[in-house]
């Protein structure tokens, strides 16, 4: 029941953030002040992403999407991305989300499972709930580039 509530809440938040970003004509919102620090700066984000990719590989819902992935390279790219989104000094140098996910046949439920794994990882790392929500709001607009199958 709790997982269903969280998934629905998350889907609503993702939808609202995506609609808000489209209404403002922007790809992503500016990073809220203090978010980079709340995630432990680059070191904290790197530790979070190292744990996150291991959990993605271990979760039966998300594991098939990461069978052929280089987990250390994935963690590095995600670290760059979250560091940049959170207002840190990093620059994301990877491919676009659309290009990376275009041929993976990702459905909304797959995306929601990944977000649940991310939330569990952030909880395990002690990231405050408010900081988690601010980061998820920054990531939400990527949904339209990641979900490629109805």
How does the language model describe each region?
Residues 14:
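Expand to "…catalyze enediolate/carbanion chemistry for C-C bond making/breaking, isomerization
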Residues 1-10, 20:
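Bacterial N-terminal signal peptides that target proteins for export
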Residues 23-150:
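Core of compact, soluble alpha-helical bundle domains
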């Amino acid at each position: 029941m709790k997982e269903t509530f969280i998934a629905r809440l998350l889907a609503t938040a993702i939808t609202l953030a995506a609609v808000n970003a489209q209404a403002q004509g922007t790809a992503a919102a500016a990073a809220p002040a203090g978010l980079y620090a709340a995630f432990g700066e680059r070191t904290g984000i790197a530790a979070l992403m190292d744990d996150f990719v291991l959990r993605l590989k271990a979760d039966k819902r998300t594991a098939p999407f990461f069978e052929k992935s280089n987990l250390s390279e994935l963690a590095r790219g995600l670290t760059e991305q979250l560091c940049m989104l959170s207002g840190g000094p990093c620059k994301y140098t990877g491919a676009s989300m659309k290009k990376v996910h275009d041929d993976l046949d990702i459905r909304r439920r797959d995306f929601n499972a990944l977000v649940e794994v991310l939330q569990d990882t952030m909880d395990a790392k002690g990231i405050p709930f408010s900081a988690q929500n601010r980061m998820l709001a920054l990531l939400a607009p990527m949904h339209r580039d990641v979900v490629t199958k109805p």
